[in-house]
Amino acid sequence: MKLISLLFKQISVVILIDSISTLPSDTEKLCYNSVIVLKLSWSLTLHIQIFMEVWQYGKFQWNDPFFNNDMDDVFNQLFRRMDNQNSEVRGISLMDNRCHRMSLLNTEQLASYPKIIKQWKYLKMVNRLLKKEGFIEKLGTNLTEQARDGLLDPVIDRENEIQKPAQKFCRRRKKNPLLVGESGVGKTAVVEGLAQRIVAGKVPETIQDKEIYSIDLSSLEAGTQYRGSFEENIKQLVEEVKAAGNIILFIDEIHQILGTGALAGEEVKGLADIIKPLLCHVAKLSVIGATTQDEYRNTILKNAALARRFNDVVINEPTAADTLRILQGIKELYEKHHHVVLPDDEKKAAVDYSIKYIHNRHLPDKAIDLIDDCGSFSGKNSQTDVETLDQRLKNKRQLRRPAIKSEDFAKAADIKRVDRGTKQKIKKTHQKEKITATIDDVAQSVERLTGIPVSDMGANDIEHLKNLDKRLKVMVIGEDEAVKMVAKAIRRNRAGFSEGDQPKGSFLFVGPTGVGKTELSQALALDMFGNENALFGIDMSEYADRTAVSKLIGTSAGYVGYEDNANTLTERVRRNPYSVILLDEIEKADPQVLTLLLQVMDDGRLTDGQGSVIDFRNTIIIMTSNAGFGNEALSGDKQRVQSLMDKLAPFFAQNFRPEFRNRLDNIVEFSHLTKQDLSQIVDLMLADVQKTLAKKSIKLEVTKAAKDWLMEQGYDEAMGARPLRRVIEQQIRDKVTDFYLDHLDVKNLKADLVDAEIVISAA
């Protein structure tokens, strides 16, 4: 009786105003015997369905003596009154069907009873209200129920992955599939897809009546501050699962069960210890779990007793073509949410960009994130009137609930009609305002997510590549041939005509000191990646020892510093895959370090000390060397015209093996600087001084005589431009500093040559 009362107390929340109908005599007697007065006007069909569900819950869940076997005859008689012509479905035993299934009526009969279809969502809401009394409803979410309500996203093109766990549930014992795969490959989506297939009946007969519940481990552990509370929760959960007989528990991040409920330093059983015996028994407990490859290896496999109770199902990353089909299947959800149109080329760009630029995540998750971010960016300028209509709709719904509770159904019906009109206005407004997302929006989404300046290969980018050498020549003086060789290699790679998976470029810069090898590297980083911080240099003199290899890839397992690899080459590339790597003075490194670089230059990847594969395909690797360009290179004209390979032959024979030389894109020779080159370098260095002074609103004018004197003092063919930098530091920066400290109010300065000395004065 309590159950019947509870039903009619709760049903007032979900009542659907309908035509008044007369109850059959059997039903009237049943209601009056239950001391329930039906004041609500429902259709006959709704009454029959509700009483059928009450009977099933009362008989199987609560064992109420009111619900006896004679009720079968009552309901069969009621169904015959509904449709005397077709009674095939009446013979279906109500005891063999769960209250949540519509299998009592076939498709033709559903078409004959449109009110059943219209009111079915309200019946399901009643079921949920009844089942909320159960402990399992407090711990998790019924994915199968969500699938019936259409609350789950469609699962596209994952049939093989869904059928594998479905087949595992057909076993007699150990019906516990464990989904193992990297994060983002769709493990949870496979479980949701299984729930959808159960609702659609596209699973083996053994599991067609199953309910999948996603369990929240934190809810299971919450409030268990007293000894035995946690075990009591587990016991109650297991008892409900056994009593239902058709529940599958889904535990995401299932490796956490090894620590859930266990107290440090105390002999208390955890969740894994308690459910472990139940997992291998017949018809005791069915669990489907999900975890990553690393967690599976480090936790589950180490517990052999737990591992043998699961059947692992590997979920691999979908291909680019599969991901594109997934995006095609879910695009309507994101178009509706963001009020934008997502064309096919935009989805194709999302897949391509996610593969090319987002390396530490997996498909399809990263491609879906790009679509979502792109949609939010494209539809960010929503009109205010849409928000006003949404707010009006919410306010009307709030007024509708009190009207239903007070049984003012006329007012509730009026509010519902207003709701329909408001929804139509919102729909029309959205249709007018829909914006079409573009490939540029996807590129901007990639830039927001990764910080990488991404642009499509359009006209602007082509011009940018064509003029690369011109821009570099402005910043690197006197090395036109070197700049030209580097620009050719970069253009070839960016245009997509390079073969293999090599880095964007791998160069060996050779030449005397101070001629611009490092300067060209900095200019290249600024031009290619828009930031000088994209260049990180490594002084290879620190790698003269063979054991220093760990500084590049991290310490191996079992050695000190295994967990701390933040400053290694591989970690820095993982965090910033678009960068210029400068290996300065490569000839000073141990040959073992050079051997390590072979894989980088050939395959564009390197495995670090922890076993992770780092992608180097988007880096530019530059090695510098002074070998063959010492002071002896200036001793005579014969050596001046000596070929590059002749100069490098002794060095290569000693340090570089043939396979290393063959993997270089180019060996770039830098020549000695002339006085004419140095005159242009003076202007560049003085421009840097001007930038520094501009921070204090100071302007400096340098006369031609002063520039010529600085060039003469700083010229050294053997040493390059570095002596000139020291001269400017001493003669300009230091003297400007002294003058500024004595004359704080002077903002316009002048540097002139007086008696063979630089003098700073007010302009």
From Swiss-Prot:
GO terms under biological process: cellular response to heat
CDD domains named among the record's database cross-references: AAA, RecA-like_ClpB_Hsp104-like
Pfam families: AAA, AAA_2, AAA_lid_9, ClpB_D2-small
UniProt cross-references to SUPFAM superfamilies, sorted A to Z: P-loop containing nucleoside triphosphate hydrolases
Start and end residues of each stretch annotated as II: 437-629
A GO cellular-component term linked to this record: cytoplasm
Binding site for ATP: 181-188, 511-518
Region annotation I: where it falls in the sequence: 136-386
Molecular function terms from GO: ATP binding; ATP hydrolysis activity
Family to which the UniProt record says this protein belongs: Belongs to the ClpA/ClpB family.
Function: Could be the ATP-dependent specificity component of an ATP-dependent protease.
Protein name: ATP-dependent Clp protease ATP-binding subunit ClpL
Taxonomic lineage: Bacteria, Bacillati, Bacillota, Bacilli, Lactobacillales
Gene name linked to the record: clpL
